[in-house]
Every structure is written in C-alpha cells, then in structure tokens.
Amino acid sequence: YLVSPAAYAALGAYMFLLILVGFPVNFLTLYVTLDHKKLRTPLNYILLNLAVADLFMVLGGFTTTMYTSMHGYFVLGRLGCNLEGFFATLGGEIALWSLVVLAIERWIVVCKPISNFRFTEDHAIMGLAFSWVMALTCAVPPLVGWSRYIPEGMQCSCGVDYYTRAEGFNTESFVLYMFTVHFLIPLSVIFFCYGRLLCAVKEAAAAQQESETTQRAEKEVSRMVVLMVIGFLVCWLPYASVAWWIFCNQGSEFGPIFMTLPAFFAKTSAIYNPLIYICMNKQFRHCMI
C-alpha cells in the first residue's frame, strides 16, 4: 500500500457512490429523451451525447477503479490500464467538445452572426461527429505509442503520462498537444461564445427585440449550458492544473494523494451534467414523471 488501507477503502466507497448515482441518472436521461418524441430536438442530441460520455466514464472507468482500490494497486495489468485510461479520457473529452458545440449553438442562435440560421438535426449530428473525432484524437494516441497510459496517484486508476520523460513515447510533445488542442483552445471558444452571448442577451433585453416568452426560453437554455461549463471547470481545472504542475516540475517530491484527490474529484463530472439537465429542463421533468 502506498497509503493507509483506510484511504483505499474510502476511495472504493467513493467510486461505488459515483456508480450508484452516475449510472441511473445518465441512463434515465438517455431513456426518457429517446422514449419521448418531443424531447428529440437537435439541442438535446448534444445533451444525449454528454450522457453517453458519462456512461463511458462510469462503466469503463469507475468500475475498474473501484475494483483495483479493493486490492490497493492496479491489478489489471497493461491492457486494463490502457482500457481504463482510454475510457476515462474519451468520456472527459467527449463532454468537453460537446460543451464546445453547445456554446457555438447558443452563440449562433442567440447572437445571430449568421442571419436566418436554424440549428437543425443535421447540424446536431455534425456536432456529435465532431465531438467524437476530437475526443478520439486525444484518447487514441497513448494506445499507439504517442505518450502512454500509466497508473497515477494511489495507483488505482490510469491516466496520460505527465510524470516521466520516458524514451520512445514522446510524452512531452503529447502533453503540450493535449493542453493546447484539447484544453486551452476549447475553453477559449467556450469563453468567447458566452462572452458574446451575455452581451447579446443584455442588448436584446434593452431593445425588447423579441417576445418575452422567446427571451425567457433562450435565457433558460443558456443558463443551463453555462452551469454545465462552470461544473466542468470546477471538476476538471484542479486536475489539469496539478497535471501541468507535475509536468513542469518533474523530479519534485509529491505524495500519491496529491494527484489522487483532483483526479477523483474530476470524476464527479459524470454526475453533474444529467442533474443540471434534469433540474433545469421543465419539459424533461414532465416527461420523466
């Protein structure tokens, strides 16, 4: 054991709690949306994509971590580490790029930079495909030799190698690529879209250009998506910051808990998206009841 057995027991219990909550709420989101035709709107396709991403994390990552924490180390070998790291990375990246698509959709619908544009089913499918392609370009390279997945923190889960300069894996270039293309760029797009969105909402309210009902509906959707972005930042920013610090300070001493806490805090992202969606979408709640 790298730390006390009680810490591994607490970790296992935490993962069990995430599975207990994460699987039902994400499955419920999928089931209710697919079962009710009026919920099958283009925007909801992207929200469904978030639920699928969260289920990847729950089934492919959380179950593995709970099992390994019961043993005190990663018992599933190289293949298990690759699978767990891949599913956790894929789920997190699909969620991030889905939020990018949602931000762009909100910007185009509310700010109207393209006149007479309507977000259709085809646009939603293109957005889904884009989020998957971008997520795969982040999750697949460590499986084929550009960087690698290794056990991290308390050695019960696997992630991208930020820790070493292992020969033959080009870990440095991959970390720089990942932080630039799969973290800074998407966040910049999200912040740009919501910056413009807030300005447009204020201007529309001042000019009373649209009916009060339309304005209220757009505001509710925008508020829901903004909350999802804030939730993503709260969950993933500590992990990204610690990973970057470790990458920039290789050779420095730090305990296993240092990386474990932000890594497992990030995993709560599989719960907050469906809960925000369920709590803030009246139509969904009516269909669910």
Curated annotation (Swiss-Prot):
One of its GO terms (biological process) is visual perception. The gene is rho. The chain crosses the membrane at residues 8-32, 45-67, 82-104, 124-144, 174-195, 224-245, 258-279. SUPFAM superfamilies: Family A G protein-coupled receptor-like (SSF81321). The record marks 84 as: Plays an important role in the conformation switch to the active conformation. InterPro entries: GPCR_opsins, GPCR_Rhodpsn, GPCR_Rhodpsn_7TM, Opsin, Retinal_BS, Rhodopsin. Phosphorylated on some or all of the serine and threonine residues present in the C-terminal region. Contains one covalently linked retinal chromophore. The modification N6-(retinylidene)lysine is found at residue 267. It is a multi-pass membrane protein. It holds the Pfam family 7tm_1. This is Rhodopsin. Belongs to the G-protein coupled receptor 1 family. Opsin subfamily.
